[in-house]
């Protein structure tokens, strides 16, 4: 093997391609006894190598979550080399591209004469229903076809350098830097060494020779700019030194200046980086680390760079793998689509393939694809999308996953090839192009490690050139295989490979051959006898040898990829999921528990989890809390195992040898299946977790999008203007004590003024005082809308009061419109009022003022309010009831994709973002950008020191590279302003204020020209002059433009475009028409003020899960109103108790006599009034004791373990009763022998007493029972139950007492007639010569010994039965050869019971025993002694 191949093999061991599996696939030594082939004799270094190798291998084939985390760490560790300038230039447009761009935008440039080939040849749009134009017109118009060129062409034409570059270089000069140099003192960096200082000085001198790119600014203006933006460029000088091109130029300059400087001196010079100057934490905070700078400079969307950071050789798939990816992703997404069986999936696969190409090859973000490549993800024959935005995001993430799989597949393939072995199993896998699942790849890798550990070690040891530590494989299987005991595996009659082929074919294509004359045990014994010297450890332990052979044969089967793949396929088809409760879970999961609906879940299929994905995530959560275990298995798994055995391993021979070999094979096969099932169950568990998280995240995403998808509140739709907003809150609602706060924001969102109202709006003495103050505030503020919210239901009262005042005084705004009063969502305001951002913006304002400011901003733009939340604040939002089940990064991703979709739907005005940091927060979500690129974008705009006039300047001013421009240009707009025309020699394009992408500007001008019905020659003339944008201006001023645009036949024109260019543009044309009518029309949903139960939840914090009809809540009595009671709940909901709902009516007493003000009582909710935030409740006992808890889940017995639930309910009842008995008050019986003891306490008390002592105590059976505990012998006590009848009350003694079905009048009667008789009989039997003390074992031994000494004599004895106090054993033997027999005798209050006959004395008992024995035959006696009604 070559050294290169060995290095790769070793690298496989050292890198993250190690297998994620257990160290051994075979059972542990603890299960099987000592593994004699375990290589524990290896030296310590090898052990260390093993451990390290194991740790390394655990990184192989990780989950997506682990990949995300590891990729971040790798980015932090990896040093990125900065790209040379010529690489960066690849992302910028050539001069030819600029020519095309500016021509599209309608800017005149000096261009070369066009040939016929380059003139446009598109046929003008025909009006719907109009006759076709003449052929001559078609030929003339056809010459314009090539005008729809791609203005992102990579071709360059040096002859025609545009005026843009010249214009960019007109200004600037040496004098600017000279003036700035005066502000830099030489001792500013006095801590530098001389070499560093000299290097910086020379760099500065070299820069002073370059032109300055600051357009039209004097030195005074530059100073002013630096004063304003200085904080934004603290790192500029360091970045410049770090810049690779500057360093290269600096080296050249130094070479010229210091030709005589030695190479040693140059080597000592230190390169200055940001890390040398600033603290790493500051760099991370400001996104200025090396990794951040690489992301900023790369012409790839930032979000894509972050996702792909951990992948190597991204985008370098072969054509076969590209097709494979298309099909793989299509299959993944199709699962959620639920296509009909008749649906032609080819169109769907084509759409997925186009989307994958846009994402992976062209680096286009989801928003761009959805907006400008819509025809490629839409159906040709039907209306609507084939792929939604959700699908596109899924494709983005699946693309990353697929590249990861392919990389690992290729790495394993390379590893296999470098081992220099040939294995048909592995070859078949790599020849199957459809095998792209990680689980199968893991099987192959594990198989190679299992089967070829020796070859791997040889390859590593042969590589003597490596200086790295070798992680040798320590395989006990290899040692077993090389031993003579392996012959027993060969004697099995079939190999693991043949078993795999049999299972795959589902028939015995390789029949099993039984050993002709040896059983398995005999085969192993023969091997041990023949190789006793080598297998000494097995010499006296053939069972260990048997287990070892079976163990490794099972390991061969369990590691065979074909076996595993077949079982995996079947398992995935038929698996079900059950919940197995733990003792803790059975006790703790009760009603209202978050796991109540899954407590007895069984037979759950993948379909159940797709429809309710939170269910499986809650199962996992409960399992992590040790409340339950998740059991994943096949339905009819035992039958499946037997079926596999029959088709793969069983022989039909019925000989004893064949039967034993079948049993041996069955045990090994089942052992292998058990391990395979365990592995596959874990795979399914991980996959279900991943799928469920994805589905819940999608639900979170949709809910959050509904929050973001709100336009600003527009009071009057006929005048769609941003309103002046007045927001009000009453704080804690203590009217008259706390002030009411109001805040005014103008239309631009600027804070104007805050107001304080100290008057009580509900003051009965001076109600007009509040009304006058409120009227004055509204008249001064002149708001168009009033927003309100607060922390408790008192806000609802203020809301109604404000509405009443406005209606009463007929207050209107300055346009005479009614002023709406609305409830505003305050989840952002709550966070803003105490946030660091709020403190920075309004450091001197009270908390409630900042709360009102945030409410007003929300009315202006919910989207901007959410974009300005910090990451921690976003994580704290309550969006979905199950969001806590998601990992933090998945939840964050769901929110981020929501932001991206909505922000790009709305767009961002470039110049406004440059001037307004609050508005600029949305920039990071524009397609192509991100946090880092947004910062870079703003810094570039600020360096211009002038407004951006046209989208093309994003390219011509080097603000964006080609790919980022392509992604973002359509979503970054520039408001039309005729005053901007005087700046530069650049025409501001109307289309820059629309959603039309610059690549479609030429199409837009064609649409406008055709709508205006211009002559083709006139259109061609304007096109040659670069003045096509004039048609846009003319169309905008045309009052009939809607009719003219809507009459165009866009479908025919789109077909013509597709035939001539291959581009599908129908949706783009529709967008052009809509945008020409109204640029950047509002597409969001209307603003959503809170309504009904939403207001109730906002003010109380209660939901339908915590506050519902039938629930029991604590309420505090506030006051009495007539015979009603006014209460309040913990959430400040007013609760009214009507006269019929409390005890006052029943007891005919006033409520104030029964209930106390300020005291808390349990109450049942009868009715909820959401509008007035109140409820009707009941305080009656029979209502409170019966709480209604709705069951919103199915207890269908096919998916719910009803049997287990009923058993657990019964067990809980018993436990509850026992606990209740233990806790209840002890009864007091007036009797000298009564003690307040339980059973154990009674025994402890009597333990030191004499035989026959007793006590009377309370019974655990209830208040109608007592118990007598009396002592029969040492540590032997009997508990006698006494049933009480005719009781006056629960605690009184019954007038009739029942003991053993006998009636007694009182306790003394029981003691005398029952207990003392039993004590007397006990003394009689224990004093008899036929009674023997001791345990049953001791008495049996005595009888056996006696019988052996006297073999011809019969013998019998009585003894205590310690397991059943009150009973005696009667044990006997007829002679020494007979079996010892045992009969049972019961002690009663009037004798001894044997065989259902009572004997008054012991003598009579002995005589009766002898009579029974004589009357029975010997055989009958022996049978009775075994299982008779009075014997054992």
Curated annotation (Swiss-Prot):
Cleaved signal peptide residues: none
Ranges of residues in domain SH2: 1232-1329
Role summary: Histone H3-H4 chaperone that plays a role in maintenance of chromatin structure during RNA polymerase II transcription elongation thereby repressing transcription initiation from cryptic promoters. Mediates the reassembly of nucleosomes onto the promoters of at least a selected set of genes during repression; the nucleosome reassembly is essential for transcriptional repression. Essential for viability.
Family: Belongs to the SPT6 family.
Gene Ontology cellular-component terms listed: euchromatin; pericentric heterochromatin; transcription elongation factor complex
GO biological process: cellular response to stress; G1/S transition of mitotic cell cycle; negative regulation of transcription by RNA polymerase II; nucleosome assembly; nucleosome organization; poly(A)+ mRNA export from nucleus; positive regulation of transcription elongation by RNA polymerase II; regulation of mRNA 3'-end processing
Biased composition (Basic residues): 73-84
SUPFAM superfamilies, per database record: Ribonuclease H-like (SSF53098), RuvA domain 2-like (SSF47781), SH2 domain (SSF55550), Tex N-terminal region-like (SSF158832)
Protein's recorded name: Transcription elongation factor SPT6
Compartments where found: Nucleus; Chromosome
Record's compositionally biased regions (Basic and acidic residues): 10-24, 85-95, 140-150, 160-177
Stretches the record annotates as Disordered: 1-215
MF terms in GO: DNA binding; histone binding; nucleosome binding; transcription antitermination factor activity, DNA binding
Pfam families the record matches: HHH_7, HTH_44, SH2_2, SPT6_acidic, Spt6_S1, Tex_central_region, YqgF
Keywords in alphabetical order: Chromosome, Nucleus, SH2 domain, Transcription
InterPro entries per UniProt: RNaseH-like_sf (IPR012337), RuvA_2-like (IPR010994), SH2 (IPR000980), SH2_dom_sf (IPR036860), Spt6-like_S1 (IPR049540), Spt6_acidic_N_dom (IPR028083), Spt6_death-like (IPR042066), Spt6_HHH (IPR032706)
Keyword check for Transcription: yes
